[in-house]
Amino acid sequence: MYLQTDRLILRPFEAGDLTRFSHINADPEVMRFFPAPQTSEETAQMLARWADKQTRYGYAFAAVETRHDKQLIGMAGLSRLEDGVPIAPCSEIGWRLTPSAWHKGYATEAARAWLAYGFDTLGLSEIFSYTPRLNLASQRVMQRIGMQHAQALDFEYPALPEGHELRPMVVYRLPSQTYVART
């Protein structure tokens, strides 16, 4: 699956992306709202899971590359959330970019393209996103792309211990009817 926006190319991850994406995932600043930075091996395993989801469902998180210089700046996309959190099963949208790509509108631009693909091409009925309550930047992206906070669905991330600062999660959602009415 390849999508293009004014400034971005959204494409499946390739073998040559592992080193760069591993570097992004190992950055403590990037992973501030995740339990821990990831090793190269963990990143490789994650990419394999995403490739499997792409095969099974026809969509998965994908590479984000800038059009002007073809640099990999992170990931964004849709993924089938199968289990592990109370809102599963559902389709989720997410993003993770290197710090040099922050505050440029790239996450919003990529997410809007993925919403259009999810609703217009895949025919999804609803798309969810979740993030730690502390991650205000991701919540702002969710709001910019038209998602609404579904407070009744907020949850405590089960894989983190009680009292962990990243355990409280906020859930945003966008039903297809709302998306269609806005476009």
Residue ranges and their predicted role:
Residues 29-50, 60-62:
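Conserved GNAT-fold acetyl-CoA-binding loop/helix
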Residues 53-57:
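Short loop/turn motifs at secondary-structure junctions and domain boundaries
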